[in-house]
Amino acid sequence: MKILVIGPSWVGDMMMSQSLYRTLQARYPQAIIDVMAPAWCRPLLSRMPEVNEAIPMPLGHGALEIGERRKLGHSLREKRYDRAYVLPNSFKSALVPFFAGIPHRTGWRGEMRYGLLNDVRVLDKEAWPLMVERYIALAYDKGIMRTAQDLPQPLLWPQLQVSEGEKSYTCNQFSLSSERPMIGFCPGAEFGPAKRWPHYHYAELAKQLIDEGYQVVLFGSAKDHEAGNEILAALNTEQQAWCRNLAGETQLDQAVILIAACKAIVTNDSGLMHVAAALNRPLVALYGPSSPDFTPPLSHKARVIRLITGYHKVRKGDAAEGYHQSLIDITPQRVLEELNALLLQEEA
């Protein structure tokens, strides 16, 4: 069986989608699974053994461009896919499998995609609370799984593969010392500071960890580089020698490898949080207005700290510098306690 998956366009969603690929492979061991997704996803997809080929989606996230999608769909006809699974909810994301003439096209209804999809599932959000469960449900025939409780347990969570050789090579590439174990920080998050733990809290935690004998490495995109510099600036000269701001300095694949080399990760609710979970790194995840009830880190080594309940549609924080008060209220001491408990568990 040949399967095409139209993948998501965000790092976190792409990571969670691996649970669908793992479930499909478990159900259909002979299946060939290709994933169409933005080209930047390739480093993630190449580390998922279930994925045969990552096909770049050349069209932008917001562009409809029906003519281009028709052309793209027609170019895939020679691959003769048997099934398609469409993970984004947008109308446009269902066009390529339709134009490719794939006989069985599955997805949640989303933007009223009757016709484009011929195996349409209507989402009951209460029956399927987690995004990862919604992805996995698509692997089963319609009506068989009525709620998340019906899914076979344990769920096949995302797992990325990184070799020891890659870790030592990439640490050398970035001149990271082997003298001290690394703790990774992921201080960025989409939509600005509202989902971020304040940089001054990260700085305070970094000071304590460096004084305890760790080195701290900051990960993220170029957009997060400034936040990283703010953390660095709060350290004294001696401490700065053991803190590296690699936000915007690494390719995604290098960040994946270096996160795998870390003893543990402290992170906001971000795409890299899901990467760290898939690498089975001990991690402390800090949530504010966004909710871990929908997209938690999928790992038994994750600890979530959140001081409020419910989901808050907040794109701007309510306090100075745009931070959300519920994240300001999470103290560095509380995070350090959770982190130390995880590190002790790991050593045991």
Swiss-Prot record:
- Pathway it works in: Bacterial outer membrane biogenesis; LPS core biosynthesis
**Knockout-associated phenotype:** Deletion mutant synthesizes shorter LPS without the outer-core oligosaccharide and cannot produce flagella, demonstrating that flagella assembly in E.coli depends on the length of LPS.
Its EC number(s): 2.4.99.24
Q: Name one GO molecular function term.
A: ADP-heptose-lipopolysaccharide heptosyltransferase activity
What GO CC annotations are associated with the protein?
Answer: cytosol
Could you tell me the keywords of this UniProt record? Glycosyltransferase, Lipopolysaccharide biosynthesis, Transferase
Q: Which InterPro entries match?
A: Glyco_trans_9, LPS_LOS_Heptosyltrfase, RfaF
Top-rank taxon = Bacteria
BP-aspect Gene Ontology terms: lipopolysaccharide core region biosynthetic process
How does changing the pH alter activity?
Active in a broad range from pH 5.5 to pH 10.5.
> What is a single Pfam family found in this protein's UniProt entry?
Glyco_transf_9
Q: CDD domains, from UniProt?
A: GT9_LPS_heptosyltransferase
Q: Which reaction does it catalyse?
A: an L-alpha-D-Hep-(1->5)-[alpha-Kdo-(2->4)]-alpha-Kdo-(2->6)-lipid A + ADP-L-glycero-beta-D-manno-heptose = an L-alpha-D-Hep-(1->3)-L-alpha-D-Hep-(1->5)-[alpha-Kdo-(2->4)]-alpha-Kdo-(2->6)-lipid A + ADP + H(+); L-alpha-D-Hep-(1->5)-[alpha-Kdo-(2->4)]-alpha-Kdo-(2->6)-lipid A (E. coli) + ADP-L-glycero-beta-D-manno-heptose = L-alpha-D-Hep-(1->3)-L-alpha-D-Hep-(1->5)-[alpha-Kdo-(2->4)]-alpha-Kdo-(2->6)-lipid A (E. coli) + ADP + H(+)
**Keyword S-adenosyl-L-methionine included in the entry's annotation:** no
Q: What does this protein do, in the record's words? A: Glycosyltransferase involved in the biosynthesis of the core oligosaccharide region of lipopolysaccharide (LPS). Catalyzes the addition of the second heptose unit to the heptosyl-Kdo2-lipid A module. The analog ADP-mannose can serve as an alternative donor in place of ADP-L-glycero-D-manno-heptose, but with lower efficiency.
Which family does the record claim for this protein?
Answer: Belongs to the glycosyltransferase 9 family.
Please name the PANTHER family in this protein's record: ADP-HEPTOSE--LPS HEPTOSYLTRANSFERASE 2 (PTHR30160:SF7), TETRAACYLDISACCHARIDE 4'-KINASE-RELATED (PTHR30160)
Q: What is this protein called?
A: Lipopolysaccharide heptosyltransferase 2
What's the gene? Answer: waaF
